[in-house]
Amino acid sequence: MTSMMERPTTIVTLSAGPVEYRLDQRGAAVVVVFHGGHMRAGLTLDERVYADADISVLAPSRPGYGRTPVTTGTTVPGFADVTAELCRHLGFERVTAAVGISAGGPTAVAFAARHPDLVERLILQGALGPLPYPDRRTRLLAGLMFSPRTEGVTWGGMRSLLRRAPDRGLRQLLAGLATPPADQVLAGLTPAQRTRLVWLFSRMRSGAGFRNDLRPRDDLTGQVTQPALVIASRRDGAVPFAHAEALVAGIPRADLIESQADHHFYEFAADWPTISDTVRDFLTADLTS
């Protein structure tokens, strides 16, 4: 598992504005990872599948997260174009895969759809699809708790709870990220995994990004021509499995891999090594055959 420290990032000013990004340089091949809500470029869970395949990782902070202003790109298609410019700026003429995790899924789809000459493959993990999301009640509640004015208080309270009573804090958070009971999900995590999640949740911030994620978005799945791998769990409480089914139905060359995770963090499931092998095979497959 990745060490518990935030990775160093860089800021570059492109035509649309400043962009924060992390570049873990390895081999010539590169994947572009779009993280989900409350995340930024320097935060990550498990990217060993890319390291094992000698693949570099480029991870930009999406609009409103980290040090990328919400005005840079702003919309899903807009930031897809910003990312294409970032790739050109860094000298990447081909991207082995666009990887979209959770709320980063729509941007990965747009990146692949709008830049087929750049992006070779698409990987979507627990990703939002073309279905409406979230429901009205959740949208209103999230708008109150994670607006730019209130998100600091919300996350400050959560950090305090995680320091004082980490298991209680994890139960509260997992209740919204899993369909099984939170006590059951927590019991299935190892002590190291619990420590890792406490570390991750304690560093999350929403900035102006989460409210931006709640904006309506166009369905671009039918415009994706590249092969795609969609990874999803029926017990994911954050993103319903129906989103994965809609993605596979909409993307002409998509395959669905079902995770057995009890929650939104598939990297902690027992079948993650098997899924990682599938991802590695997908990344290294010959696309000309």
Give the positions of each predicted feature:
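Conserved HGGG/HGGXW glycine-rich cap/lid loop of the alpha/beta-hydrolase fold
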Residues: 23-69
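Conserved acidic catalytic loop of the alpha/beta-hydrolase fold
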Residues: 78-96
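Gly/Ala-rich beta-loop-alpha elbow adjacent to hydrolase catalytic centers
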Residues: 100-104, 108
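Flexible "cap/lid" loop of the alpha/beta hydrolase fold
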Residues: 122-154
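Alpha/beta-hydrolase
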Residues: 142-144, 148-220
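Short beta-strand/loop motif that positions the catalytic acidic residue
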Residues: 224, 230-232, 236
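Conserved alpha/beta-hydrolase "acid-adjacent" motif
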Residues: 237-243
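Catalytic histidine-centered segment of alpha/beta-hydrolase-like enzymes
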Residues: 262-276
